[in-house]
């Protein structure tokens, strides 16, 4: 047991928190960071200027509490999402993790179950634990896919009260077809399950990929969560949001902290939404780099998964940790997600992507046994 865990063990922690470690990817000082799926292109200059101006204006009123209902921001988010959504359908918080936490606070808790399908976003079980919600680990196919029949059966078998569907899935990058969402929703009727479709990376999906937003009408237990951390390059600003039936957003108001969304955060998000053309242009370039990575990994004899995100999950590695370390030694940090034979890399700028591909190929050429 580590010293940190020993110190924690001396405190009167809740039982379900004992032995746990805080969530977090390695934060290392290396030239090329491709490990946490950030938008590697940064904030364009004109968007920076708009944010600076908006925050300066907000600063003049920082002695007052912010708009508790963040009305203007909800209007802008509804307009951005489209699909006939109104501000009453929108909720936002400090990152999509806080949105998910608020959903669990409202609909989870002692005696209730949340179902996820690993490998998937590693925060789901931590959020469940933090709200005393039992986390049930479902199963995927051998290729990490999830089909409608299997997913629906697992919802019925577990009697889950909350279901997490990550699309595109993290860490695999693969999207879910909407028939899976529909089947899961119908299967959750008996337990009145809240179905969350986590679309944090949806803007990076291939053209004409449908969103679960199209399924919201008539489905009051369906929630679609999004974030401005990825496509909008605002990971440092912390703004996540969701779309759902108005009664669901009203339920979230029961558990939110007062004035939870600062005036600075609201101003930043609004400025980015109002100047999103440049940001979406960067998204298109990131998609080009992602597809380039897939093509090059295939050429190297590796096994990349089809990706609708800003990262690529790839297998075919006998010793992924050694490859990870070799890349780190070359100044490139990617993610070892703990899945045998696999690693995950964020699509970088063109020079960053080139550096990753060249370093990886050099490692593979010099250490052939690492290829399975």
Swiss-Prot record:
Similarity comment: family membership: Belongs to the class-II pyridoxal-phosphate-dependent aminotransferase family. Histidinol-phosphate aminotransferase subfamily.
GO molecular function term, any single one: histidinol-phosphate transaminase activity
Protein's UniProt keywords contain Glycoprotein: no
Complex formation: Homodimer.
Xref: PROSITE patterns: AA_TRANSFER_CLASS_2
Catalyzed reactions per annotation: L-histidinol phosphate + 2-oxoglutarate = 3-(imidazol-4-yl)-2-oxopropyl phosphate + L-glutamate
Gene3D superfamilies to which the protein is assigned, alphabetical: Aspartate Aminotransferase, domain 1, Type I PLP-dependent aspartate aminotransferase-like (Major domain)
Cofactor(s) needed by this chain: pyridoxal 5'-phosphate
One Pfam family here: Aminotran_1_2
GO biological process terms, semicolon-separated: L-histidine biosynthetic process
Keyword Cell membrane: no
Originating organism: Paenarthrobacter aurescens (strain TC1)
Pathway connected to this protein: Amino-acid biosynthesis; L-histidine biosynthesis; L-histidine from 5-phospho-alpha-D-ribose 1-diphosphate: step 7/9
Broad class of enzyme this protein falls into: transferase
InterPro entries to which the protein is assigned, alphabetical: Aminotrans_II_pyridoxalP_BS, Aminotransferase_I/II_large, HisP_aminotrans, PyrdxlP-dep_Trfase, PyrdxlP-dep_Trfase_major, PyrdxlP-dep_Trfase_small
Modification N6-(pyridoxal phosphate)lysine occurs at: 230
Classification via NCBIfam families: hisC, PRK03317.1
EC number(s) reported in the record: 2.6.1.9
Keywords: Amino-acid biosynthesis, Aminotransferase, Histidine biosynthesis, Pyridoxal phosphate, Transferase
Protein name: Histidinol-phosphate aminotransferase
């Amino acid at each position: 047991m580590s010293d940190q865990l020993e110190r924690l063990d001396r405190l009167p922690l809740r039982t379900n928190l004992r032995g746990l470690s805080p969530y977090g990817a390695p934060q290392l000082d290396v030239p090329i960071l491709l490990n946490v799926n950030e938008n590697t292109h940064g904030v364009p200059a004109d968007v920076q200027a708009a944010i600076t101006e908006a925050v300066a204006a907000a600063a003049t009123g920082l002695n007052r509490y912010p708009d508790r209902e963040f009305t203007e921001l909800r209007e802008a988010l509804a307009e951005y999402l489209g699909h006939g959504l109104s501000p009453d359908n929108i909720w936002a918080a400090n990152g999509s993790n806080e949105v998910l936490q608020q959903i669990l606070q409202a609909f989870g808790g002692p005696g209730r179950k949340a179902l996820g399908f690993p490998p998937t976003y590693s925060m789901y079980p931590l959020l469940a634990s933090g709200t005393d919600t039992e986390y049930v680990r479902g199963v995927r196919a051998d290729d990490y896919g999830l089909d409608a029949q299997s997913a629906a059966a697992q919802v019925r078998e577990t009697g889950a009260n909350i279901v997490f569907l990550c699309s595109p899935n993290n860490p695999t990058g693969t999207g879910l077809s909407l028939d899976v969402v529909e089947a899961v929703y119908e299967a959750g009727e008996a337990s009145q399950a809240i179905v969350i479709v986590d679309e944090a990376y949806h803007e990076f999906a291939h053209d004409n990929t449908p969103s679960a937003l199209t399924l919201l009408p008539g489905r009051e237990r369906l929630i679609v969560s999004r974030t401005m951390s990825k496509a909008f390059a605002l990971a440092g600003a912390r703004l996540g949001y969701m779309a759902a039936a108005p009664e669901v957003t009203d339920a979230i108001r029961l558990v939110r902290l007062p004035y939870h969304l600062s005036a600075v955060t609201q101003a930043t998000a609004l400025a980015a939404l109002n100047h999103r053309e440049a940001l979406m242009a960067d998204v298109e370039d990131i998609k080009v780099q992602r597809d380039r990575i897939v093509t090059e990994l295939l050429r190297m004899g590796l096994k990349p998964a089809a990706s609708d995100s800003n990262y690529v999950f790839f297998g075919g590695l006998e010793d992924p940790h050694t490859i990870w370390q070799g890349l780190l030694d070359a100044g490139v940090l990617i993610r070892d997600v703990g899945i045998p034979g696999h690693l995950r890399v964020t699509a970088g700028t063109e020079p960053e992507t080139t550096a990753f591909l060249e370093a990886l190929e050099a490692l593979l050429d010099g250490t052939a046994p690492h290829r399975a």
